[in-house]
Amino acid sequence: MNLFGKVVSFSRGKLNNDTQRVTAWQNEAVEYTSAFVTNIHNKIANEITKVEFNHVKYKKSDVGSDTLISMAGSDLDEVLNWSPKGERNSMDFWRKVIKKLLRAPYVDLYAVFDDNTGELLDLLFADDKKEYKPEELVRLTSPFYINEDTSILDNALASIQTKLEQGKLRGLLKINAFLDIDNTQEYREKALTTIKNMQEGSSYNGLTPVDNKTEIVELKKDYSVLNKDEIDLIKSELLTGYFMNENILLGTASQEQQIYFYNSTIIPLLIQLEKELTYKLISTNRRRVVKGNLYYERIIVDNQLFKFATLKELIDLYHENINGPIFTQNQLLVKMGEQPIEGGDVYIANLNAVAVKNLSDLQGSRKDVTSTDETNNQ
């Protein structure tokens, strides 16, 4: 008779998408790991909320690069950066979008347009109970979701469930009941009722009353727990799944670790936002580079890689920018975290830096050096 199998049953818990904890798993190791994943999600979501969505217009050029014109203050700028979009504020909305994206295969957003002007009025989470046309939805797919049955967290926790459950039996309880092989359900109900009463009775001071026919036999064994190496392994698997170093969470990451995390985790999400928002929120005629169009529009996101630069690197950039200017004074101020100033939209260069269209124009440009002298020096 398989008494143990009839009396006790084990079941795998389902992942709670809000708390990132598995139902019925109350072990400290599981809760610790779940909180660890929640911190990872918060870090990624908070990084995304720092960026700004820039609605821009490019002017086509027959020679050289197309020039960019900012459309700050447009309907897209207002909705993407400022309006609450059905939540407390704009940052709260984008934080929820990213958190959903970290635990689901995709996130659908519904864009609300003005029927008369075609302007974007709002951007909301799609209603699961309503059917939409594909072109009506901004669909963001998750690069971290594994499949429909599990997530990175659930997959990692599954590997430790067996060990914890196998070591869960701590003792035997002899109760005042007769075991009828043909009626194990009644026996099981009596056993569970007895255990429940004992737990409720011991909730006050740890003591519980039992009758004179009830006996508790504690098993002399080491209860199953996770050691440090196993915890570190789980943390490593989780961090690797998000291309993250633990120092990122601790605030002690090196510049290389920060840039790797940003390039591997944050920028792929930003690129997807750029492409999907541009494709679904800007009309085809305004978006495509077609004959007859002088301008075309995009939504771009600043990757903010300059925020990882050290003060020395920013100073070096300032000096190099004088020799070969690529940023105006105001652009440099913004990259250093300062505000633009009036009259700062100029390039500053020393006298050794000149503007040329072709490298051959540099030959003989200095008054004190002739073309022949330069050739001889070479």
Curated annotation (Swiss-Prot):
Coiled-coil blocks: none
Q: What is its main location?
A: virion
What compartments host this protein?
Virion
Question: Which family does the UniProt entry place this protein in?
Answer: Belongs to the skunalikevirus portal protein family.
Give the domain of life: Viruses
User: Which keywords, in A-to-Z order, does the entry hold?
Assistant: Capsid protein, Viral capsid assembly, Viral genome ejection through host cell envelope, Viral genome packaging, Viral long flexible tail ejection system, Viral penetration into host cytoplasm, Viral release from host cell, Virion, Virus entry into host cell
What does the UniProt record say this protein does?
Answer: Forms the portal vertex of the capsid. This portal plays critical roles in head assembly, genome packaging, neck/tail attachment, and genome ejection. The portal protein multimerizes as a single ring-shaped homododecamer arranged around a central channel. Binds to the terminase subunits to form the packaging machine. Necessary to ensure correct procapsid size during capsid assembly. Once the capsid is packaged with the DNA, the terminase complex is substituted by the connector proteins gp15.
Which GO biological process annotations does it have? symbiont genome ejection through host cell envelope, long flexible tail mechanism
Q: Which organism is it from?
A: Lactococcus phage SK1
Protein name in UniProt: Probable portal protein
> What interactions and quaternary structure are annotated?
Homododecamer.
Phylogenetic lineage: Viruses, Duplodnaviria, Heunggongvirae, Uroviricota, Caudoviricetes
